[in-house]
Amino acid sequence: LTRILAIDTSSAWCSVALSIDDERPAFLHQKVSAGASQLLLPWIEQLLNTAKINLSSLDAIAIGVGPGAFTGVRLGLASVQGLAVATKLPVLPVISLDAIAAELIKAPAFLAAAPKRFLVAIDARMNEVYWAHYETTPSGLPVRLGEVALTSPESIVLDDIEFVAGSAINEYGDRLFARSKNVFLKTQLDPEIGVSALGVLACAKLSWCAGLAQDIHQLEPVYVRNKVAFTAEERKQANI
């Protein structure tokens, strides 16, 4: 019996999922304008109450650790730290692009394209993109090839990429495809998919089965970038 609570607040959405054994996960997911802090804990309580279990009876808590919105990533980690310390539960950190990839493989457009390699790219603000390459596997979730990168849209490497997904598509358009030699790539897209607790949960289940749960004191955010915003001088030079 495996019971995992999954949380993600690294984007503009508050997202919580509860998985009990092989049952369909309970899932709450909503776009939030002023951060997820007011929704997160009540939602967790709601899911636990509906399932008639308490927090301490969980096996682990999964959390999206970024990259994404700095304040959202911090909120999620702080909330999980409070919950895990109180209950002595282990945690399962999940990188946001991995969570997107885990859900993407079920999307109709992706299934129709059946790519071997694909790219997940999300808007990182400041004219930059968080991105990573993935490879599909015969069974289970896709495998990330290397670390998550942070570059300008034009610098994204698209060699052998057959499908592109993520918020960077709508934000940067043709700039993303500057280095693509594949004229069909612009038709193999999923611009709407984003990170959610269901994707976090899918990755976390694999981590749990592989024995990769961590002590809460090992939990760290994945920011990729160390800087939150342009300075006034940088904004002036870039005409922002």
Predicted regions and their residues:
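Acyltransferase
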Residues: 185-240
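DPxDG-like acidic metal-binding loop motif
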Residues: 62-96
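Surface "functional belts" at beta-alpha junctions
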Residues: 23, 35, 90-194, 223, ...
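Residues at secondary-structure transition points
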Residues: 31-39, 70, 74, 78, ...
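N-terminal beta-alpha supersecondary unit
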Residues: 1-65
